[in-house]
Amino acid sequence: IPDLASSRSTLPVLTKGPTGLLGPRGPYGPLQRFNIELSARGPAAVVGVLGKSFDSWLTKLGLPGPQGRPGPPGPGCRFALSNQCIKLAVEFAGQSKFSSFLANEGKKEGPEGEEGPRTEFDGAYFAGGKFPVVGKPFPQLKVFHAEPPFPTSRSTYGPSGSQPGKKGVVTPFKGNQPLKFNDFLVESDSRCPPDDSSFERSPAVSGHSSPATLNSRMKPAGFPGKGNGAPLKNGIASDPLENLKNRLGSCFPDVLDEPPTSPFFTGPSGYTSDGLNKTPTVSKTLTAAGDPGPGAGKVLESSKTDLVALQGEFQR
């Protein structure tokens, strides 16, 4: 199993999606005329609407064509596993249930600290070349000898920011509780649609948890480090999705900028609601719509024709 932590990559798995959904209804068929004898009732009103005489007062209005051909197979979706869980995913192929055997350690180093607060100092220099700092002096401000003319305006400077973060707390994963495979699986959503922007989402399948429950069985990783600057969002992000990205670090892809809106496993060959009873084929029914079908008209029966509606059709 490759170690993906250093390469900051994810485990790409491409699976062929199911057959696409049927396309939308076809357009209306062409207008056709019939040679029908004018009756003594009704046609005069139609003639008055059109402003001219004609030999057929019944027009074949094209009805919607048949549904389009099925779309192409879906492209499948890439999903990502944290690299500590790759072995778990491989071992799962031959097991239906298992107990946790993988220690998921927290991140050992926090991210870089943010830039520290800026502090104002007076630009008037002492004769010795040093300048007084209003407030607490910072060691990053170097003492230097100024050349005349000495500035007298007040300027705002801050210490050098982006200090390295401190090491986070390592929180090992407790390995004595049963897990489900989808506790470690997060399916990307925003990068999976096909090139054609018109695609259909599969209906939601009950029984699947949302990506925010990824941490339901995982102990949190080390909190982000605090640099010499301001702390990062009180040490941990408040947004659940951002929280996961901070915890998993390099093992979490950037594809989850938008939370997925569909369940983890969809399609006829995917997992059932308990995530344990079928072969691990993960796919997502994202397919392009089919081509519109050709129009096919249908003769309207004259005895059932509503002249008022027919006039509206002619006006349209």
Swiss-Prot record:
Gene Ontology BP annotations: shell calcification
Keyword set includes Glycoprotein: yes
Post-translational note: Glycosylated; contains mainly glucose, galactose, galactosamine, glucosamine and glucuronic acid.
Expressed in which tissues: Component of the acid-soluble organic matrix of nacreous shell layers (at protein level).
Polar residues bias spans: 152-163, 207-216, 269-278
Gene Ontology MF terms: chitin binding
Key word Secreted present: yes
Ranges where the record places region Disordered: 1-26, 149-173, 189-238, 259-278
GO cellular component: extracellular region
Localization per Swiss-Prot or TrEMBL: Secreted
The entry's keywords: Chitin-binding, Glycoprotein, Secreted
Superkingdom, natural source: Eukaryota
Principal cellular location given in the protein's record: secreted
Composition bias type Low complexity, residue spans: 10-26
Protein task: Involved in nacre formation. Affects morphology of calcite crystals in vitro but does not inhibit their formation. Binds chitin.
Name of the protein in question: Nautilin-63
Organism listed in the record: Nautilus macromphalus
